[in-house]
Amino acid sequence: KLNTLTKDPDGRSRFILNLFVGYGADPSILIDAKPHVGTDRLVDGVRGIRCEIEALGGEIHFHTKFTYDPVRDKDRKIILAIGHSARDSYEELYAAGLHMEAKDFAMGFRVQHPQAMIDADLYGAVDAETRAALGPGAYKVTHTSAKNGRGVYSFCMCPGGYVVNSSSEPGRLCVNGMSYHARDGKNANAAIIVSIRKSDYDGAAHPLGGIALQRTLEERAYQLLGGRVPVQTYGDFKADRETTEETVGSIGPEIRGQYGYSRLNDIFRFPADSPYASLNEFNETFIEGMESFEHKLHGFAREDALLCGVEARTSSPVRIPRGEDFCSNIPGLYPCGEGAGYAGGI
C-alpha cells in the first residue's frame, strides 16, 4: 500500500510509483486512489531494484550488522535510513551521542473479519460481477475516546489479507498484516490501535523509553503461547476470558505462521505502582473504539471477530531531530525514513 501521498509538491511519490511500475508493479497504481503493489509483487520488484543498484556500482550487504564509530566515521556522509525496529542501532547511536527524543505512537491488535462482510457493508447488495469489478473492500475508521481523549483507529488495512508474525527479537512477538496482489484471502484484517502517549512510558526520562515498553508487551505476547501468535475472539476479550478451540466462532484465522487460541487482556494490564499503570485504560478504550466502529460497519464488533497480538510497531517511538539541512547533531549523519520518526504509516 502506498497511500500517504500528501504534502508532496516536488513529486517524490510519483517518482516512487513510476519506479515500482518499472520493476513489475501493476500500472494501475499510477491512477488508483489507494495504490497497492502486493507482497508477492514487491519481492520481485525489490530484487530488481537491488540488482540495478549493484549494476550501478553499489553494494548490498546481507547478514551484516551496522555499526557506527564516531572516530572512524567522522568524515563520512551517511544517510541513516534504518527502520523503526532497528533497536540495536538506536542504542548504539544514542551511546555515540546522536540526539534522540521520545514521541507518541500507537499499539493494539490485528483484527480479522470475513472479507465478504466488509464488502457487503461497503457495497451493499451487488451481483458477483459488480463485486469483482469493485475489488475487495477497504475501510478506514477512527474514534476519539470521550473518557480519556485517546485515539482509536484502523491502520494498515489489508483486504483479502493475512496476519503475519513479524517478530525480530528472541523471546518477543509482534504481528503485522499483508495482502498479496490478488487480495483474494477469505478475511480482511487491520490493526486497531490506541494512541500511546510519551507520558505513558515516561518518555521525558529517556528517549528510548518507548522501545522498552514495546519490548515488555512483545515479551508478554510471546509468553502466552511460546512464540505462536495468540488469537482471541472479540467477545471473549470483552468478557476477559480465554478463547479455546471449543469457543471460537465461525471465522477461521488467516495467519501466516503458527498460532493458537489464548487471552490477550493482560498484555496491556499493569500493577498500580508500575510506570506503565496509565495503560490500564487501554482495554476499555479499545472496546469503546470497536463498539463505535460497529455504527459505521455492521458486524465490526461481532462476537467472533478475531484479535491477534500484539501489534506494537505501527510507527517509530523515537524521533531523531535534524536541522534545516536535514543533518542530525552529528555532522555528516542524515537520518530519514521511519526510523528517524519523520515518515511513517502506509
PLM regions: where:
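Residues forming the flavin
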Residues: K1, T6-D266, F270, S274, ...
